[in-house]
């Protein structure tokens, strides 16, 4: 088989992977705090006894785009937005801590605070508020509750959000969509980040996704055309080999 087929096949495979990343970004264009996944392709020279005239294509995923999203003022007390390097802490399915910029906090049936189904972690563990109470969140993450029918002066703190600070190159997205520390960051800062009292939040505000839908749609069209071109290359090479075999059989 001609080596050109392997080259085009590898490029087509990586184009499909790039299309999957683009589709995932587009699907999360309305997810609060979402960070677009970056994807790139690079050429890898093929080493061997012959001349270095061919290259293969491999994916290079540098991480996520940490550009802040647009702030949307919702006036909802449980919506919070963080500083650029701030992260909310939630409990992942495996019990470990995960980090997110999604500040759309919900109250579960038992009063537990959650974000996308993950329990919100406070400085003492998962946070639970009294059922039916009016919740407010201060700039330092302190959560206060006012029970129904009680006078305003009886509002009392029930917990405090665990707010941590991590730069974009210190975290990476996991398969569950949550961010976790990279191996290098864990070696330097430990397996679990400590709460950072300098982080401040804004209540009643949500940070939107930093995905640009128009650009994502354009990328999807470009990926589709690139894949089609690579399929044509494979077809052309296969047809040329077929004609060459016919000529050899006639001689």
From Swiss-Prot:
PROSITE patterns: FLAGELLA_BB_ROD (PS00588)
InterPro entries registered for this protein in UniProt: Flag_bb_rod_N, Flagellar_basal_body_rod_CS, Flagellar_FlgE/F/G, Flg_bb/hook_C_dom, FlgE/F/G-like, LlgE_F_G-like_D1
Keywords per UniProt: Bacterial flagellum
Main location: other
GO cellular component: a single term: bacterial-type flagellum basal body
Quaternary structure, from the entry: The basal body constitutes a major portion of the flagellar organelle and consists of five rings (E,L,P,S, and M) mounted on a central rod. The rod consists of about 26 subunits of FlgG in the distal portion, and FlgB, FlgC and FlgF are thought to build up the proximal portion of the rod with about 6 subunits each.
Family the entry assigns: Belongs to the flagella basal body rod proteins family.
Name under which the protein is recorded: Flagellar basal-body rod protein FlgF
